[in-house]
């Protein structure tokens, strides 16, 4: 979900849990494949999607005390809320002569981990 006018793109991690609990079992049942023949399930986040968790790996946004805290939710790769921090990082790298055009295309995007983490 994008918060209008903010550049934020957040998601509820319960979506992933619901897929594991409801959608996958239904898909397996409809497929006719025996669950004994399934050796694994892959899960992937687009780089860089961040899922903050507590010490028990519970997503922070699923805890009542954090529901209204945007930084507790999954930040999708398309989250641009850290553009200011990305600009600051790029300026510092430019001043220090550390921009690597081959690896980065010349700049750090607000979609990457470092600007999102720096914003905290």
Question: Residue ranges of each PLM-predicted region?
Answer:
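Glycine-rich phosphate-binding/catalytic subdomain of phosphoryl-transfer
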Residues: 2-120
């Amino acid at each position: 979900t994008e918060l209008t006018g903010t550049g934020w793109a957040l998601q509820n991690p319960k979506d992933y849990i619901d897929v594991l609990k409801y959608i996958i079992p239904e898909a397996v049942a409809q497929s006719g494949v025996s669950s004994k023949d399934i050796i694994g399930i892959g899960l992937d986040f687009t780089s860089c999607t961040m899922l903050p968790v507590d010490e028990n790996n519970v997503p922070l946004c699923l805890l009542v005390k954090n529901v209204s805290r945007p930084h507790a939710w999954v930040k999708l790769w398309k989250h641009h809320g850290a553009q200011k921090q990305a600009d600051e990082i790029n300026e510092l790298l430019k001043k220090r002569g550390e921009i690597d055009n081959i690896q980065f295309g010349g700049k750090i995007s607000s979609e990457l981990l470092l600007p999102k983490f720096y914003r905290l």
